[in-house]
Design a protein with these regions (language model features):
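C-terminal helical cap(s) of enzyme catalytic domains, especially alpha/beta-barrels
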Residues: 119, 136-157
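Structured core elements
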Residues: 43-45, 75-77, 103-106, 124-129, ...
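Generic detector of intrinsically disordered, low-complexity, polar/charged segments
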Residues: 11, 126-128, 153
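Buried, small/hydrophobic-residue-enriched core segments of structured protein domains
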Residues: 1-100, 112-114, 120, 134, ...
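Glycine-rich phosphate-binding active-site loops on the catalytic face of alpha/beta enzymes
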Residues: 124-142
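Conserved small/polar residues in nucleotide/adenosyl-binding loops
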Residues: 170-172
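Anaerobic metallocofactor- and corrinoid-dependent redox/one-carbon enzyme cores
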Residues: 157-166
């Protein structure tokens, strides 16, 4: 169900990646495909394009579809932007749609200091995805390397894809 599984028959586990969302013609199609793979606990990455205008609304649509099929567990993950602010807005949107039990996960180079700051700001978060800073102290910096999908092949043509964060949209 993941890209590596589909392309190379290598089973993979983990969270939804921005490259997964970019692989599909639209965010909603990516979310639906992911929900088919992981209907029991579907956690959707909502910040590839725009958290509040498309990510969360599309996640809610997919959760409604899953709910009708008897799957009631899920959540969203926010990986960029003002996570405290976005989590509060997203929580309100999920609650208003009836998904009060769906979780909100924060990630993005988190450490104990950033997590504390998020909590002090009243972020509406249920869990934290801690990656490279889990095993490397801030005093001993880490080289943060991430995979970014730049293009996909569709009908024999290369089609560009881009991931934008909330902060990068300010500068465009």
């Amino acid at each position: 169900c993941t890209i590596t599984d589909r392309e190379f028959s290598v089973p993979a586990m983990g969270t939804m990646a921005h490259s997964w969302v970019q692989l599909f013609p639209s965010e909603i199609e990516a979310f639906r495909a992911y929900a088919e793979c992981y209907p029991d606990n579907c956690v959707l990455l909502v910040d590839t394009y725009n958290v509040l205008k498309s990510g969360v609304p599309n996640a809610i649509k997919v959760f409604e579809e899953l709910d009708k099929r008897g799957y009631h567990n899920g959540g969203i993950r926010i990986d960029s932007g003002d996570i405290a602010y976005l989590s509060k807005k997203a929580r309100k949107m999920l609650d208003e749609a009836g998904f009060t039990g769906h979780k909100i996960v924060a990630s993005n180079s988190l450490d104990e200091y950033l997590i504390r700051d998020l909590l002090v700001q009243g972020a509406k978060l249920d869990s934290f995805g801690v990656g490279e800073r889990l095993v490397t102290s801030k005093a001993e910096p880490v080289f943060g390397g991430v995979y970014k999908l730049t293009a996909v092949e569709e009908d024999g043509k290369i089609v560009p894809r881009i991931k934008l964060s909330e902060l990068s949209l300010i500068h465009i």
